Amino acid sequence: MMVAMIIENPLRGSYIERPNRFTVAVYVDGERRLAHLRDPGRLRELLIPGNDVILRKASSGNRKTEFDVIALRRDDEWVLVNSGFHSDLAASIIESSAVDEFRGFRIEKRECSFGRSRIDFLLASENERMLVEVKGCTLVRENLALFPDAPTERGRRHVEELERALSEGYHSSVLFLVFGRSARFFSPNHEMDPEFSSALRRAHEAGVNVIPYTLATDINEKVLVYPLRRIAVRWPGESP
């Protein structure tokens, strides 16, 4: 199985609370410390007092937070919650030829400006171009992955820009990185954000590729993240 990412020197801690959107308090070696959380979602199923957390020592000494949050435990698995790794993980999937829509394309540029947004990837083949936006999905209920777990105006705007790009000759894709081994289906979370859900379905019907791909995270002396499989999309209202 292909390992997409290796993270060295992980530390274990215990979650206490979330003072603000991007900061959590944790116990490390019995002491209360602050850690930076790069996932802006609500993460209610993961941010439970006493839950195990994987951390990495911050590289800069000029921060208020000593650590970066890497992963949190959900039942018997680890869930990556650091969006700083999404671009490299997505690149490994794009370059692996595991997804039909990406075959024949190479990564031309990361962080490509389009309209009012910055899209994660511009891909190119001999005669065609594709814009790819990457979203991390951590909410998995039974075998169903749901995105988003909090309303996302930015996410809706990205999807609308991708749909508009079709009329300018681009191919467009949304790659959802689903952090959960048990997920077998993906659905936009209509209950949480009906505007995003509707925008994604409209974009898909217009020709935007919706590609959910599961990844697993194993932790021992290192953090190993590896892609598993593409899963099916189940649109709101469809029968299981």
Swiss-Prot record:
Protein's gene: sfsA
Highest taxon of source: Archaea
Annotated InterPro entries: SfsA (IPR005224), SfsA_C (IPR040452), SfsA_N (IPR041465)
GO molecular function, one term: DNA binding
Entry similarity comment: Belongs to the SfsA family.
CDD domains membership: SfsA-like
Pfam families reported in the protein's UniProt record: SfsA, SfsA_N
HAMAP family listed in its UniProt record: SfsA
Gene3D superfamilies, per database record: 2.40.50.580, 3.40.1350.60
Protein name, entry field: Sugar fermentation stimulation protein homolog
